[in-house]
Amino acid sequence: MTFEQLIPLIIMAFALGMDAFSVSLGMGMMTLKIRQILYIGVTIGIFHIIMPFIGMVLGRFLSEQYGDIAHFAGAILLIGLGFYIVYSSILENEETRTAPIGISLFVFAFGVSIDSFSVGLSLGIYGAQTIITILLFGFVSMLLAWIGLFIGRHAKDMLGTYGEIVGGIILVGFGLYLLFPI
């Protein structure tokens, strides 16, 4: 993999991780032990490996079966997902969040990683390198979740919704780039 191929994946990993970062900011404002913070971040990272992997496998299958139609659908999926993230971030009401424990942690991690499934689907259609991609997504999401949790412990409402909006805009940009390569 060349440096030029790695840069878009790194940017996309940060875009996907912004959702985990934003939610972790709010969660970090609760009383959490360091061990809980580490465990939450690792769980989010693992889900950001599993979900895009499943998406990439499915995306490769669709690409082999449907070719150009699958490429177009992958780009549209990224654009739609990006707009959805921006839209839902703007309309989201500030609700009280509780620290996820046990099964609720898995549900939480699944929720913040569901967008990585869609991105994985698109990347699978385009034939991205699986191992590098999913490890990068997992590591960056884990790191951003930890950063969000630690910042949330010390500050209130620094980025919140704005972090999700930036992530959504980046996904729209990548979708447009796939539709109209420069």
Curated annotation (Swiss-Prot):
It is found in: Cell membrane. The chain crosses the membrane at residues 6-26, 37-57, 71-91, 101-121, 131-151, 162-182. GO terms for cellular component: plasma membrane. Its main location: membrane. InterPro entries: Mntp/YtaF, Put_MntP. One of its GO terms (molecular function) is manganese ion transmembrane transporter activity. The keyword Transmembrane applies. Keywords: Cell membrane, Ion transport, Manganese, Membrane, Transmembrane, Transmembrane helix, Transport. It is a multi-pass membrane protein. Belongs to the MntP (TC 9.B.29) family. Probably functions as a manganese efflux pump. This is Putative manganese efflux pump MntP. It comes from Bacillus cereus (strain ATCC 10987 / NRS 248).
